[in-house]
A protein has these predicted regions:
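Unchanged
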Residues: 1-130
Length: 130
């Protein structure tokens, strides 16, 4: 979704990851992802170099036997579990690509570790007028 000309809503999540020093990022796309893929390829703002990790995009494998797209975030994660397992990362951040927000994921990770949590969900109260 374009915002202010050349920006996309996903830029906020990716910028948050860059600013939090996250090096390996996977983007799970759905149908009609051509424009998004072009944007991701042409943008060098995030500095996800292959030497440090990289930016990976995944589209669901639609076949004659499996004719459905991702059925939500959990399904996207499940269909790409091998990538997660092979990444050898101790923690995973799952962020929506359609939110406009600024967040330091390091603070969330510190909280997550301190609480010895299996998972941590971050939410925000939004006033009705907003």
């Amino acid at each position: 979704m374009p915002i202010a000309g050349s920006y996309r809503s996903i830029d906020f999540a990716l910028s948050n990851m860059t600013n939090s020093h996250i090096q390996k990022v996977a983007v799970f796309t759905q149908y009609n992802a051509g424009s998004l893929n072009e944007h991701l390829i042409s943008s060098k703002w995030w500095n996800f170099g292959r030497k440090q990790g990289g930016l990976f995009t995944f589209t669901p494998s639609v076949t004659a036997e499996n004719n459905f797209w991702y059925r939500g975030t959990a399904d996207a994660m499940a269909q790409n579990l091998s990538f997660l397992k092979n990444s050898h990362e101790p923690y995973v951040v799952i962020a929506s690509g359609d939110g406009v927000y600024k967040m330091d994921y390091n603070k969330v990770l510190e909280y997550h570790i301190a609480k010895k949590a299996d998972f941590t969900v971050v939410t925000a109260n939004v006033e009705e007028k907003d």
